[in-house]
Structures are given as C-alpha cells and as structure tokens.
Curated annotation (Swiss-Prot):
PANTHER family the UniProt entry points to: PHOSPHOENOLPYRUVATE DIKINASE-RELATED, PYRUVATE, PHOSPHATE DIKINASE 1, CHLOROPLASTIC
Pfam families hit by this protein: PEP-utilizers (PF00391), PEP-utilizers_C (PF02896), PPDK_N (PF01326)
Transmembrane segments: none
Region (Linker 2): 498-533
Catalytic residues, chain numbering: H454 (tele-phosphohistidine intermediate), C839 (proton donor)
Gene designation: PPDK
Cofactor: Mg(2+)
Entry protein name: Pyruvate, phosphate dikinase
Purpose of the protein: Catalyzes the dephosphorylation of phosphoenolpyruvate and diphosphate to produce ATP.
EC category: transferase
Record's comment describing the protein's domains: The N-terminal domain contains the ATP/Pi active site, the central domain the pyrophosphate/phosphate carrier histidine, and the C-terminal domain the pyruvate active site.
Reaction catalysis annotation: pyruvate + phosphate + ATP = phosphoenolpyruvate + AMP + diphosphate + H(+)
Record-stated family: Belongs to the PEP-utilizing enzyme family.
Length: 885
C-alpha cells in the first residue's frame, strides 16, 4: 500500500485517501495550475498513528525523507541547507472540509542557521526573521501545545514598546528579537530544548497534525455536523514547499471563492493582504482588501487577470464553487489549496439554480448538493425591510441573516449563558478553539478579520449570522467591556447584528420571518417536488399551524393531536371536571361542553386544508396527565393544613383521590390510547362525533374534505373492530342522518407497538391506513424509556460507539426500521392499496426519510418548520434509490 504520494502522482478524485487539501493540490497540478512542489501522507497513516497509541507508523519517516529528497532535486534547494534552504508548510486535510478545525505549520525547516541563509538569499533580513518568529509560534502552539497567549502577549508588548499598531511596522531587529524571545518562552513552557533539526521538526509536525484529528474542536465539529467515518476518517498531511507572501509589497496572500459564498451571486469574491502570510487572512489578524482592488495594484501586475483565469478553470473542472488560497511571491502567483466552497444554504441554493441554468449541472445534482439539515438556515429571520434606526457601527457582511442576543466575550461563557438565554458572541477575532461558542451563539461579531476569516467561514458553514471586521469596536476581554464610540457595551447587553449588511444595532430589533416559497429556494423546492415520490405532510393541531404548514409546502396533515386541543386555558378546567366525574352522566355532561369546541377546531383545520388529508388522532395520553402531579397536590394540601387554610381543601383532596386512582406503575404502556377509548368509550364517541360533524358542515359549505380518523396504541385487531362496531358506525350513521349527506372518512391506526407491526396483516383488515409512531415504537423495540435513556446513558452509548446515533433522533434501521418493513409488507399482503406514513419525530429527519422512502411509505409527517428539509430529503432519497411510485 502506497503511503506517500507526490502531487503529480496522486489521484485527485480520492479525497478519502488524500484528504480534501491533498486531493486539491494533486488535481491543480494535473490541470496545469501553478502549484509548489510537495507530497501527501495518506489518511490511512493517521488511522494507524491513532491505533498505535499516537506513535508514528513504522518506516513512514523513511518514506517521507525519500519524497523530501525528490522535492530537493526538483527545486534545487536542500532541507536544512545552510546556503539554499528548502522550507515547507505542513497542512492537515480530511476528506470533508472542516474550516479552522485542524492545524497548519508554516516555514518549517527554519533554525538559527537556515534563517541566516534565507536572509542572504532574499536580501531581506526582516522577511527572514518575520518568517522565523511565525514558525516558532505556530510550531510551539500546534506541535508542542504551548498556549498561544504566550506569543500573542509578547508580540503585543513589542508593538506597544515600539509605539506601532501593525506587525508590518516592526523592523528586522524587532523580528530577530521576537524570534529569540519566542524560542526562550517555548523552552520555558515545555521544559525542553526547541528542536533545531529540520527532520525532527517535520516528525513533530506530522504527529501534531495526526493528533489534531482527535482534538476537542475537531471532534466537536464532526459531532455537530454528523460527519461519520464513512464520510471522513482521519486527516492526510500535505507537505508543501514554502512560497512567501511576506517578502515585500510585490508579494501577497489571499483567499478567494469563485462565487460569493454568502449570497451565491456569480461574482468573483475574495480578499488579499500584501506583505503577509496565508494564516494572516484566515486568522483575521488584519482586515484585508477586496480582491478586485488587485486589478489596480501596480506592485502585482497581471496577477488579478491570472486569478480570473484560474477561477474559470477551477469551476470548469469541478462544476462546484471553489474556495482557494493563493500566495504571490515577488509577482509570481502560486496556488496552495482548492476545495468545494463552504457556503451557507442561501448561497448553496442560488449557485445550484444558477449552475443548472448555465448548463454546468443537472437539477438532481443541484438538489444533492444541499445538506438537508442546512435548510433550517433559510428559515432564519431577517432585518425589517425598511428599518430606519442608524447602526452603532458597520463591519463586513460575513454570513447573512439577522440575530439578536446578550453579548458575551468568551466561548466558554457563551456555552454557559446560552442555557438560559440567547447570546451573541463578540470577539476581537475568533480562533478554532472558539468553536463550541459558535454552536450555541445566535450570531458572531468580530472586530478584526475579513469575509474569509475563520469566523466568517465557520459561521457560514453553520448558517449563523456573522459580522466581521467591525473595527469601530474596541474590546477589553479582561473587563468584559466593548466600546463603540462613546457607548460602553457590557456583558449581557443586547445587540442585534445584520450579517447581510454588516450593520450592528443597539438593543433588540423585531426580526421578520423569511419567505420560503419564492426566489431561488422556491425553485429548488419546486424541483424537489417534481422528483420526490413520498408525500410530505405536517403535524398540526390548530388552524394557524395548518396555515403555516401550507406556506411551507405541506400536502396534508398527517397528525392532529387532539389532546393538545384539551390543554387550552379555557378547556382544561372542563377536562379536569370530566375526569373527576363520578358518574357516566356527569362525565357526558362535560364532554358535551367540550364537543362544540373540538368541532370548531376541526372545522378550521378542514377548511384551511381544503380537500387535503386531515388525520385526527383520538386521545392518546393517560388521563392523569391532565391533572396536577401527586407530589404537587400532597405539598399543596400539607401547606394548606399547616397554615389552617380550609377554603378549597376538600376539592384538592377529591383531586388527590382521583390522581391516586389513576396512578400507574408504567403509564407509557398503560391505560392510554385505544385502551382508554375502550374502557371509556364516551370520550372517543365525543371526539368522533365532533370530527364527523365538522366534516359534514364543511362539505355543506361546498368545501372539499379528506377526513381520516386514527386510533393510537393499537396492539390487537379486535380493538379496532370493537371501536368500529360499538362507537364509530353508530355515530357515523347519526351524523349522516342529522346532516342528510354522505360523510366520507378513512379509518386507520398508529403502528407504535411492536405487536401491531407483527400482526399488521390482521390489522389491515380493519385499517385502511397505517401511520408509524416511531417515538413509541423505538421505546418498545429497544425497551428504552426515552425520558430516562436520553438523560442517563444514550450519550455515553453514542460516545463509545455502542450505538451509531441516538435512535430517538435518527431512525434505527436494523431494529425499528426492520419492524416497520415487516408491517408494510404484511399490511399490503392483506390490503395492497394500504396507505402508510410516519408521524413520529423521525418524519423530519433526512436519514429516516430515506429509509421510509426505501421501504415504500406513501408519506412522512413532521413539524411545519421541518417540511422544507423533508421535501429536499425526499427528493434526495429518490435520486439515490429510484422507485416508480
């Protein structure tokens, strides 16, 4: 097995082996772009390194040395040479892009001797020692785990001492002194000599990159974005000959996107810094210039035109938006990296539509490029169209959308405070180790850095609004204060940012809901509907929720939870009285009070849906859930007796008695659903009557209806037979007689008990449709209580890889999924036209939707805000696993 590949020998399509960065360098070499010489160490070596207890695989360094000698031969330079030294960068790169998650070391090979040679060769002492101090700080931080504050404070102190603001204002002697102080401080921190042998440095660096794969921020990023080992397993290491953007004003470094990664607009987008190294742009240490200004830059003749040509070549080859890094060394341009651009959902959607219209890709390819979970970003709120207040300050619009939150100055504080409120992370510049703060923040605001800085790239990838480079803000992290002009912003103060314009506003701004069905996203959703075979319904309990569902593209209501209608403030007291009733007559009296209220809700739903399916699930939870808890009542009664208060005491004791009567050892598999409807048929009778009368009244108004009655917790076909004969048919006859019309409806069941799935052939003799309740079906199949397991052991099981994921979030295909497949197969043996859907929370989760498509379900039902996600996921499922209907 080949373990190291020269750029000209590597297969650029094999990102799994060479990593995205290595594969990109190989591809750029292949298509004739100017790439420095170098080689890639494969991801397999990273996996072996970790499996060996973080030890270098045997013989690997010998192979690295052979490849380094080839680079020496091609370049005419010598690694560690004291006359013409070869210096390299050591870069990480996994199969999937993880901006800022992994580590890069520049200028490797420098020591006290090679730096003198570099100064002589370039006739630029300042450049040589600037490169040296950068190398020491990067190497110390990444390879030796030195706290970067050690270097940052030393550099800041030197600038203060010299009375300057920018690194570029320090002279050669300053850089010399900084390099030696950095080495001394590194040795003090590590209690060991700084490595001077270039091959020792290289081995340290390769090990550091391999180790970073299992570093906290890389693991957190993979967990947040659900990046599995199948998608990316280990990081490759690219060893690249150094080229320098910090050799003077005829040198530069930059980052570009072939299209705008924030909006998707087909315009060249990027930034560059003169007399700088690549990490300066990405780290956001200085705020760069926009790339178009290079066209007028007399120090860099022809470079902008060359970049435009490279932009065209990259998109022509990859048919994807590319994010690339370049360096210009003394007017000569080199490409250091290209990868598929990390864009927010807005840009991904627009570029997809535009590329289809440009003939670069197909509709199917455009849809497959959208990560379904990223669709949530398109539902972000925005600033009001005509907002008149002047902003406090303006930065760069780095990631679109608007966000309001309480200001925090530290990622750890963001995590802590986000547990109770919305937070906005405000930093001078962000670093990769701030990633945990990004996850919880509503938005990110930085004082330094451009649109291609770490903060901007990661925020766009997460779909978080971001304003970067707001230089009018001065932050004092120690005091947790920011100054914007004369205004002091303290931790906890509210700010609003607009990532689409770069504006920052004082206080909370009322934000507007997005428009889902129009524009580029509307086009993508239209294409998704043309492709997908599985319907997308909504879980909705009120007419207002149904209206919102239609706006998002729902094709029906797959679950109306009637118990939620009982929980309204004016209804709950009636429900409680019904439960406390001692006689059937008394119970019916209160049910009769509830009936017209439920009927009005049903009328609203049916009218809103206007002929689309409305599936009403009859009462599901046990009755005790509508009453106060035993502990609550006992405490209240104890306190009343203790204080001598007697008013209302008798009523409390009546409720306590009923709560004790209704108490169950295991209520989740107890007296609920059809069992309750069988022992207390008057409850289901009221609900059926309300729904059928609502259907009749809507029909009489000339509005189409598609009414479906769904029974929960069925385990035995006789439960359905009993309910049909003794309740459903008599009520249906009475309603048709009362209104003098036919009132059509469908009668079906939830399949949420394992026995129902295993006897689906019998149950299908009664039920004309099934709907999987996968929350309870998962509980039953695993014998896990959801409430207990999610808090106690499932996270540990996922961490230890006992389970691949939380089965209550992502459908368990081998177990729960197989039970579903059995039910579908058996049910359709009895009733070939059987309609089958899913209405558990899995109905909006992309992987689960794919499984539902694969086993032949007719529809999925999910919350309104998951409908666009489900539509995209359903189309992707059809593209991956085509079926006829």
């Amino acid at each position: 097995m080949q373990r190291v590949y020269a750029f000209e020998d590597g297969d650029g399509t094999n990102k799994k082996l060479l990593g995205g960065k290595g594969a990109g360098l190989c591809t750029m070499t292949k298509i004739g772009l100017p790439v420095p010489q170098g080689f890639v160490i494969t991801t397999e070596m990273c996996k072996q390194f970790i499996a060996n207890g973080n030890k270098m695989p045997e013989g690997l360094m010998e192979e690295v040395k052979k490849n380094m000698q080839l680079v020496e031969k091609k370049s005419g330079k010598v690694f560690g040479g004291e006359e013409n030294p070869l210096l390299v960068s050591v870069r990480s790169g996994a199969a999937m892009s993880m901006p800022g998650m992994m580590d890069t070391i520049l200028n490797l090979g420098l020591n006290d001797k090679t730096v003198v040679a570099l100064a002589k060769l370039t006739n630029n002492e300042r450049f040589a020692y600037d490169s040296y101090r950068r190398f020491v700080s990067l190497f110390g931080k990444i390879a030796l785990n030195v706290d970067d504050e050690v270097y940052d404070k030393t550099l800041e102190n030197k600038k203060v001492e010299k009375g300057v603001k920018l690194d570029t204002e320090l002279d050669a002697n300053d850089m010399k002194e900084l390099a030696q102080v950095f080495i001394k401080k590194t040795e003090e921190f590590t209690k060991q000599p700084f490595p001077v042998d270039p091959y020792a440095q290289l081995e340290f660096a390769i090990c550091a990159v391999f180790r970073s794969w299992m570093g906290k921020r890389a693991v957190d990023y993979r967990r947040e974005f659900k990046i599995t080992p199948e998608q990316a397993d280990g990081t490759a290491v690219s060893v690249v000959s150094m080229v320098y953007g910090n050799m003077g004003n005829d040198s530069a470094t930059g980052v570009c996107f072939t299209r705008d990664p924030g909006t998707g607009e087909n315009m060249f987008f990027g930034e560059y810094l003169k007399n700088a190294q690549g990490e300066d742009v990405v780290a956001g240490i200085r705020t760069p210039q926009i790339i178009s200004k290079m066209a007028e830059d007399a120090d860099l003749p022809g470079c902008y035109e060359q970049l435009l040509d490279i932009r065209k070549k990259l998109e022509g080859y990859f048919h994807e938006v590319q994010d690339f890094e370049f360096t210009i060394e003394r007017k000569k341009l080199y490409m250091l990296q290209t990868r598929n651009g990390k864009m927010n959902a807005t840009a991904t959607v627009r570029t997809g539509v535009d590329m289809v219209e440009e003939g670069l890709i197909t509709k199917e390819q455009a849809i497959m490029r959208i990560a379904p979970q990223s669709v949530d970003q398109l539902l972000h709120k925005n600033m009001p169209a005509n907002y008149a207040e002047a902003p406090l300050v303006k930065g760069l619009p780095a990631s679109p959308g608007a966000a309001t939150g309480a200001v925090v100055f530290d990622a750890d504080d963001a995590v802590e405070q986000a547990k109770g409120k919305k937070v906005l992370l405000l930093r001078e510049e962000t670093k990769p180790e701030d990633i945990h703060g990004f996850f919880v923040a509503e938005g990110i605001l930085t004082c330094r850095g451009g649109k291609t800085s770490h903060a901007a790239v990661v925020a766009r990838g997460m779909g978080k609004p971001c304003v970067s480079g707001a230089e009018g803000i001065k932050v004092d992290v120690a005091k947790k204060i920011a100054k914007i002009g004369s205004l002091e912003v303290h931790e906890g103060d509210i700010l609003t940012i607009d990532g689409s314009t770069g504006c920052v506003y004082k206080g909370e701004v009322p934000l507007e809901e997005p428009q889902v069905g129009s524009g580029y996203f509307g086009t993508i959703l239209k294409w998704a509907n043309e492709i997908k075979k599985i319907g997308v319904f909504a879980n909705a309990d009120l007419p207002s929720a149904a209206k919102k569902a239609l706006e998002f593209g729902a094709e029906g209501i797959g679950l109306c939870r009637t118990e939620r209608m009982f929980n309204a403030v004016e209804r709950l007291p009636i429900v409680v009285k019904m439960i406390l009733s001692n006689t059937l007559e008394e119970r019916k009296k209160y049910l009769n009070e509830l009936m017209p209220l439920q009927k009005q809700d049903f009328i609203g739903l049916l009218k809103t849906m206007n002929g689309l399916p409305v599936t009403v699930r009859l009462l599901d939870p046990p009755l005790h859930e509508f009453l106060p808890t035993l502990e609550e009542l006992m405490r209240e009664i104890f306190e009343m007796k203790l204080s001598g208060k007697t008013e209302g005491l008798a009523e409390k004791e009546v409720v306590l008695k009923k709560v004790k009567e209704l108490m169950e050892v295991n209520p989740m598999i107890g007296h609920r659903g059809i069992r309750l409807g069988t022992t207390n048929p008057e409850i289901y009778e009221m609900q059926i009557r309300a729904f059928l009368e609502a259907t009749a009244e809507v029909i009489k108004e000339g509005i189409k209806t598609h009414a479906e009655i769904m029974i929960p917790n069925v385990t035995e076909v006789n439960e359905l037979i009993n309910l049909r004969k003794n309740v459903l048919e008599p009520v249906h006859e009475e309603v048709e007689k009362k209104y003098g019309i036919k009132v059509p409806f469908m009668y079906g069941t939830m399949v949420e008990c394992v026995r129902a799935a295993l006897t689906a052939d019998k149950i299908a003799t009664e039920a004309s449709f099934f709907s999987f309740g996968t929350n309870d079906l998962t509980q039953g199949t695993f014998s896990y209580s959801r409430e207990d397991s999610e808090n106690k052991f499932i996270p540990k099981y996922v961490e230890l890889k006992i389970l691949p994921a939380n089965p209550f979030e992502i459908l368990d295909r081998p177990g729960v999924g197989e039970v579903m497949r059995i039910a579908v197969t058996k049910g359709r043996q009895t009733r070939p036209e059987l309609l089958v859907g899913i209405c558990g929370e899995h109905g909006g989760e992309p992987s689960s939707i794919e499984w539902c498509h694969m086993i032949g379900l007719n529809y999925v039902s999910c919350s309104s805000y998951r409908i666009p996600v489900a539509r995209i996921a359903a189309a992707q499922a059809q593209i991956r696993h085509p079926r006829e209907n």
